[in-house]
């Protein structure tokens, strides 16, 4: 029986990843390193024999440009793509733009770990008159007030990612199409938690590295039977550890 596969990839390193700043819905681009990571992910997928029928990404350019570079390496730049805000990074509220290590020095490592990785913990929220509030951004003009976040926990991120998975992405996977999703650390953590039924403590320790393809294999009932990264295991572990350490005081 043919195994159904799904590929997830977190965007390559962004300019604010490089500066160790909380990014959330702020629309920063890839760093030079991030472009290289995205191209390397595409080459790795090509070398492993992957090709796709459809792609999904967020409305943030670090994920969009990652997908562009991946598909370019696969010689599939023509692939149909759907962009949705529901795949955006978790909204980090008033933390957006702040340096993570400096924030940890001010509030403590454990508080920042909870803000970054806690399941139901929300960072301090933005006010609606703050220029960072997404209601001021034309790409979100059709969203209702209830849909526009002032801050988000991982639990709230799950509330938008999982219905999008079930209603939009999964039916395409079930139809036999080969799908790739280029998104963000926390929108992908939300999906992994749901697919693998991870507990709150397990998801607290899950860190997804930038620019590394994550492959899911599903059984005939579309239940996950295997999840694995493509690439060198030691390098991937080091990248995941670096993600975990971003929120610690220096």
From Swiss-Prot:
Annotated metabolic or biological route of this protein: Carbohydrate degradation; glycolysis; pyruvate from D-glyceraldehyde 3-phosphate: step 3/5
EC number: 5.4.2.11
Paired cysteines (S-S): none
Residues flagged as site, Transition state stabilizer: 184
Active-site residues, Swiss-Prot/TrEMBL: 11 (tele-phosphohistidine intermediate), 89 (proton donor/acceptor)
Pfam families: His_Phos_1
Catalysed conversion reaction: (2R)-2-phosphoglycerate = (2R)-3-phosphoglycerate
Binding site for substrate: 10-17, 23-24, 62, 89-92, 100, 116-117, 185-186
Single GO BP term: gluconeogenesis
Molecular-function annotations in GO: phosphoglycerate mutase activity
InterPro entries according to UniProt: His_Pase_superF_clade-1, His_PPase_superfam, PG/BPGM_mutase_AS, Phosphogly_mut1
Keywords linked to the UniProt accession: Gluconeogenesis, Glycolysis, Isomerase
SUPFAM superfamilies: Phosphoglycerate mutase-like
Assembly with partners or alone: Homodimer.
Similarity field: Belongs to the phosphoglycerate mutase family. BPG-dependent PGAM subfamily.
NCBIfam families xrefs: pgm_1, PRK14115.1
Function: Catalyzes the interconversion of 2-phosphoglycerate and 3-phosphoglycerate.
The protein's name: 2,3-bisphosphoglycerate-dependent phosphoglycerate mutase
Annotated source species: Enterobacter sp. (strain 638)
Protein's gene: gpmA
């Amino acid at each position: 029986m043919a195994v159904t596969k799904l590929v997830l990839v977190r965007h390559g390193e962004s300019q604010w990843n490089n500066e160790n700043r909380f990014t959330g819905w702020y629309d920063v681009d890839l760093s030079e390193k991030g472009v290289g990571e995205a191209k390397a992910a595409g080459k790795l997928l090509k070398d492993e024999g992957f090709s796709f029928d459809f792609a999904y990404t967020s409305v943030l350019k670090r994920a969009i440009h990652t997908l562009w570079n991946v598909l370019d390496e696969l010689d599939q730049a023509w692939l149909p793509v759907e962009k949705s805000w529901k795949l955006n990074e978790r909204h980090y509220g008033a933390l957006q733009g702040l340096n993570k290590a400096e924030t940890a020095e001010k509030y403590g490592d454990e508080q920042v770990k909870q803000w970054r990785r806690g399941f139901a913990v929300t960072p301090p929220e933005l006010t609606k008159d703050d220029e960072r509030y997404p209601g001021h951004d034309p790409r979100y003009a059709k969203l209702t007030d209830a849909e526009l976040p002032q801050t988000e926990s991982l639990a709230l991120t799950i509330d938008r990612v999982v219905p999008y998975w079930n209603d939009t992405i999964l039916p395409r996977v079930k139809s036999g199409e080969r799908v790739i999703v280029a998104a963000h650390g926390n929108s992908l953590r939300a999906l992994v938690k749901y697919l693998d039924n991870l507990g709150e403590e397990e998801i607290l320790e899950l860190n997804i590295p930038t620019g590394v393809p994550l492959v899911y294999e599903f059984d005939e009932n579309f239940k996950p039977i295997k999840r694995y990264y493509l690439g060198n295991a030691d390098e991937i572990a080091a990248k995941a550890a670096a993600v975990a350490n971003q929120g610690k005081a220096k």
